UniProtKB/Swiss-Prot annotation:
Residues 1-47, 299-326, 338-391 are annotated as: Disordered. It comes from Xenopus laevis. Residues 355-366 have a biased composition (Acidic residues). CDD domains: FH_FOXN2. Signal peptide: none annotated. This is Forkhead box protein N2. Keywords: DNA-binding, Nucleus, Transcription, Transcription regulation. It comes from the Eukaryota. Expressed in the developing eye from stage 23. Localized to the prospective retinal layer and a layer of cells lateral to the ventricular zone. At stage 29, expression extends to the branchial arches and the brain. At stage 33/34, expressed in the vagal ganglion. At stage 36, expression in the retina decreases. Not expressed in the eye lens. GO terms for molecular function: cis-regulatory region sequence-specific DNA binding; DNA-binding transcription factor activity. GO terms for cellular component: nucleus. The lineage of its organism: Eukaryota, Metazoa, Chordata, Craniata, Vertebrata. Residues 381-390 have a biased composition (Basic and acidic residues).
Length: 430
């Protein structure tokens, strides 16, 4: 096989043997290299003599281009937008580098918003800035944000309000005139911000963004990041931004849940005590228990909620007063009359409800036989409650009887007055 035709006249390379052809064809068919190969080989030419097995590529460009592998990134298709092979319009630049103006305008700074806010505040003479001045500082130092969507301003505000690194300052400590709040760095969390800034892979940017020692350093132009430092910064995790975003999401979700809980009514099931026999009406006085759907008993503090009574005795008193004063039915009145007043001369009880159980009848028979149980703490407490309830009932009955007697007296007086008036009228007629 003769020398390959179509080569450049100043390069004479013998054609490789047939064993090297498969390796060259694999290099030619690689899917992740075509655009980079076409951009970085200025002297490459193709061999075209009509046969597919004789089409060989000049490989001199591999020795001339030394920065080829630096432009590749694993897991990406083609060339990334921040690659030095691209300019602002996206065209391939043959020089393989960019000017600082093009880089600063097209690339996003590798700092988190908390670090940007920290640097802006530290560059101020009073170490405190309003939100508008923070915006202007970021726009002056990083022209990328002048063409970026306006959502970055919301991120700055969220970091100021939700991040623990920053706090509001009283207006007297900073600017006297103007509107809006002043923000400064919390001294407690300032070392952590400095440590996060030291983790940046470029030392020159660190030297520039440390707090200034003179007013001249405040007005100095910031360091423009190179493409290599930007590629190193791609894998940097912005912890503070993630924390601020998660805090904002949690805040929104908690507000929505509270609004839904307020709108949704919570039904409470009132569990009334089981109806007992009239003999044991005052033996057990359990207070009414309010239960939710899950069956748990709600313990309500009387100091917090004034709609509920503080003890079971008070609830029994309220219940007894309402039932006696209303006089809705004979059973309700009879249920609150003491046992001694309900027993007859022969010691027999009055009528019983149809819902009484066998246990209630057993308790009644024990009470008729004169069996006295041993006193305990619960019995003493129940006896106190019964005494108080009976005293209240007696007072209510006395008041009702007095009112009835008063009405009866008024009636008798009216009757007597009418009789005397009729008698006098009869006398006058005669």
């Amino acid at each position: 096989m003769g020398p390959a035709t179509g080569m450049t006249p100043d390069k004479n390379i013998e054609s490789p043997t047939a064993e090297k052809v498969p390796g060259l064809s694999q290099t030619e068919n690689m899917g992740s290299l075509p655009e980079e190969v076409g951009a970085a080989r200025p002297k490459a030419s193709m061999v075209d003599n009509g046969a597919t097995d004789e089409e060989l590529t000049n490989l001199n460009w591999l020795h001339e281009s030394t920065n080829l592998l630096n432009n590749f990134s694993l897991g990406s298709e083609g060339v990334s937008a921040g690659s030095p092979l691209y300019d602002i319009e996206g065209d391939l630049s043959p020089s393989g580098c960019q000017t600082p103006e093009k880089l600063s305008a097209s690339s996003k700074p590798p700092y988190s918003f908390s670090l940007l806010i920290y640097m802006a505040i530290e560059h101020s003479p009073n170490k405190c800035l309003p939100v508008k001045d923070i915006y202007s500082w970021i726009l002056d130092r990083f022209p990328y944000f002048s063409t970026a969507p306006t959502g970055w301003k919301n991120s700055v505000r969220h970091n100021l309000s939700l991040n623990k690194y920053f706090q509001k300052v009283e207006r007297s400590h900073g600017k006297v005139n103007g509107k809006g709040s002043l923000w400064c760095v919390d001294p407690e969390y300032k070392p952590s911000l400095i440590q996060a800034l030291k983790k940046q892979p470029f030392s020159s940017a660190l030297a520039l963004y440390t707090p200034p020692t003179s007013p001249t350093s405040v007005s100095s132009r910031p360091y423009v990041l190179t493409s290599a430092s930007r590629r190193k910064q791609i894998h940097y995790v912005k912890d503070s931004d993630i924390d601020a975003a998660t805090a904002m999401m949690l805040l929104n979700s908690s507000i929505k849940e509270e609004a839904l809980d307020r709108q949704k009514p919570q039904p409470l099931k009132v569990v009334l005590p089981k109806k007992r026999s009239y003999a044991s009406a005052f033996k057990h006085c359990p207070p009414l228990s309010l239960q939710e759907n899950d069956g748990e008993v709600i313990n309500i503090d009387p100091k917090e909620d004034h709609n509920y009574s503080a003890s079971g005795g008070d609830s029994q008193r309220c219940e007894s007063r309402s039932s006696v004063s209303s006089l809705s039915s004979v059973e309700e009145v009879y249920e609150f009359i003491p046992k001694n007043s309900r027993t007859g001369s022969d010691g027999s009880e009055g009528f019983h409800s149809e819902d009484d159980t066998d246990i209630d009848y057993e308790e009644d028979t024990l009470g008729d036989n004169g069996y006295v149980p041993q006193p305990s703490g619960n019995d003493l407490h129940g006896s106190k409650l019964r005494k108080e309830a009976s005293q209240d009932i007696d007072e209510e009955l006395k008041e009702a009887a007095g009112s009835l007697l008063h009405l009866a007296g008024i009636r008798t007086c009216l009757d007597s007055l009418l009789k005397t008036a009729k008698a006098q009228s009869h006398k006058h007629r005669k």
